[in-house]
Amino acid sequence: MSSLPWLTIIVLLPICAGLLIPLFPNEGNKIIRWYTLGICIIEFLLITYIFCCHFRINDQSLQLEEDYNWIDLINFHWRLGIDGLSMGLILLTGFVTTLATLAAWPVTRNTRLFHFLMLAMYSGQIGLFASQDILLFFFMWELELIPIYLLLSIWGGKRRLYSATKFILYTAGGSIFLLIGALTIGLYGNNGPLFDIQSLATRSYPIALEIIIYSGFLIAYAVKLPIFPFHTWLPDTHGEAHYSTCMLLAGILLKMGGYGLIRINMELLPHAHAIFAPWMVMFGAVQIVYASLISLNQRNLKRRIAYSSVSHMGFVMIGIGSLTNIGLNGAILQMISHGLTGAALFFLAGTSYDRTRTLFLDQLGGIAISMPKLFTMFSIFSLASLALPGMSGFVAELMVFLGIVISQNYSLTFKIVITIIEAIGIILTPIYLLSMLRQMFYGYKIPNTLALSLIDSGPREIFISLCLLLPIIGIGLYPNLVLSLWNSEVEYILSQY
């Protein structure tokens, strides 16, 4: 047992360090950048230390628990704890946020506010994955909204205000349902308010009430994940946001929805989840194909990648709805895998825009010769996104695929139909990704004079790309590297079904 409140330290360190940024001179962009990057590295090293020295793999019980009374009147506690599921996502958060901070190096406008918002997001993301109080979970969920809104509305593209407004309306609207669900589940019963997630997991509810609560939570998570038809904010947001913000959105923010589905809906409301599971599988399968077809018709590079994210989240839904060990493990692995590949693709799309000053695929072409390093990295991560064997996406999608096939909860006809739809989506994925590569890097659309003046990726960009690539290959070759983290938690959750 550790004597230090490690989880509180890693939750509060980024935002507390961010509060010191206004003390730096506004002209000292380089100082602010190095300071923020240093805080992110220290935070990630602390997370790694906690994982290596204080976390016990294959232990399904809650670890490093902390419980501090916060608001007596409503029994609101600062209650933190981690297990394998949350530890994996906390590691992903630390890794991607550190690289996103390095990716934001070219930002020179309002750097103090920009880097403070990055650190505030960092705290909110870590806090959400470590929360063991459902009101604290909601608080951390909401902590993300304002930083992203400001990052989008100030440093976004030409339609940034429209995209930022759409984002805040969708996510704030979904958050209302999350708050109502949290209050309903916490105030149910005659023993006073109870918001401790571990205690709530032992409660039972009337099936009608459980379905109502589940529906409210599902709407909130459907916006974040996102699930069709609550996905339309995502392409607009990605299309206008700075690519470092896109890395955080694709790498971490979408995973908050999947985490909520598993941690809250599956664990606290198993009877309702069993009822909703077939619908999640059906919507997930349709979403894979629908988003793939829409992605194929996108002229904007970042919007095409955004719709590919929507498609990949369909596999997460199928895995969660399969109610099998291999399927749920595959869904979690898909979240980790997409967190890496999605962040990498948006980063490379942003670096491409920095050089060509366009995101429209029909205005690109012929830049492979002048930028071979960018071409090579873009090709590798596109192959990773389409689940090339030997990379993490292949293992994740294969596990989800097998999870629905071996599931004993569905009829043979249902499984055949879902499998066929999944297969169609798997076929469509390389079509829109490889056509994206063809339109960007082959042909002669960019004038030769411009093509010759384009500067290839530098050391910073290559370093970020390699950092994202190594875990993708490592997990693809040896998936037990991460599957062992949360397998015991998956077995515990599925024991209720």
UniProtKB/Swiss-Prot annotation:
Belongs to the complex I subunit 4 family. This is NAD(P)H-quinone oxidoreductase chain 4, chloroplastic. It is an enzyme of class 7 (translocase). Its EC number is 7.1.1.-. Keywords: Chloroplast, Membrane, NAD, NADP, Plastid, Plastoquinone, Quinone, Thylakoid, Translocase, Transmembrane, Transmembrane helix. Coiled coil: none annotated. It is a multi-pass membrane protein. It is found in: Plastid, Chloroplast thylakoid membrane. InterPro entries: NADH_Q_OxRdtase_chain4, NADH_Q_OxRdtase_chainM/4, NADH_UbQ_OxRdtase, ND/Mrp_TM. The gene is ndhD. GO terms for cellular component: chloroplast thylakoid membrane. The chain crosses the membrane at residues 4-24, 35-55, 87-107, 113-133, 134-154, 167-187, 207-227, 242-262, 274-294, 313-333, 386-406, 416-436, 462-482. PANTHER family: NAD(P)H-QUINONE OXIDOREDUCTASE CHAIN 4, CHLOROPLASTIC, NADH-UBIQUINONE OXIDOREDUCTASE CHAIN 4. One of its GO terms (biological process) is electron transport coupled proton transport. It catalyses: a plastoquinone + NADH + (n+1) H(+)(in) = a plastoquinol + NAD(+) + n H(+)(out); a plastoquinone + NADPH + (n+1) H(+)(in) = a plastoquinol + NADP(+) + n H(+)(out). GO terms for molecular function: NADH dehydrogenase (ubiquinone) activity; ubiquinone binding. Its main location: plastid.
